[in-house]
């Protein structure tokens, strides 16, 4: 391309600045998830951005917008009753001969390393509404997951 057809600003490749993606669907939260979201918003609001470089301040403001949106759209789900797997339950299951325990939580609260999975995750969707002793299909395998136990989680 001829230099005559280039703008000086073409020399700088600027990455587009997008908002942080909001997960589709409802923003269900546990009591713990709502508390953590409020704490995150408060912590971000307490940070003085006036001393930050412009890019750092923009990133901070984008993060704050995300968490304010998540707080505004949060739907606190009631503590589940009954024996079935539901949002806000601690589930012990057996998969491939190994027993594991997870808590089914909202998207922002999910952390598989801590045993917290989102209600939109494939495993949570597969075991939803199952009761102890039931086997459910998962990963293309029939009866792959056996539900061992279910307990409501009030606030962890």
Task: Describe the residue ranges of each PLM region.
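Helix-rich terminal scaffold detector
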Residues: 1-71
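Short glycine/threonine/proline-enriched tight-turn/helix- or strand-capping micro-motif at secondary-structure
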Residues: 71-78
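Non-DNA-binding regulatory cores of transcription-related proteins
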Residues: 78-148
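Short, compositionally biased
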Residues: 148-156
């Amino acid at each position: 391309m001829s230099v005559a057809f280039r703008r000086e600003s073409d020399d700088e490749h600027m990455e587009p600045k997008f908002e942080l993606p909001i997960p589709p669907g409802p923003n269900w939260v546990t009591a713990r998830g709502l508390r953590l979201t409020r704490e995150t918003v408060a912590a971000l609001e307490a940070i003085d951005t006036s001393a930050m470089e412009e890019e750092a301040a923009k990133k901070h403001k984008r993060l704050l917008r995300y968490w304010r949106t998540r707080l505004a759209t949060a739907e606190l789900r009631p503590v589940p009753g009954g024996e079935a797997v539901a949002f806000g339950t601690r589930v012990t299951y057996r998969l491939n001969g190994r027993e594991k325990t997870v808590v089914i939580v909202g998207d922002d609260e999910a952390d598989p390393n801590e045993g917290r999975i989102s209600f939109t995750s494939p495993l949570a969707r597969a075991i939803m509404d199952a009761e102890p002793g039931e086997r459910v299909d998962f990963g293309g395998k029939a009866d792959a997951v056996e539900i061992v136990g279910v307990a409501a989680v009030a606030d962890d």
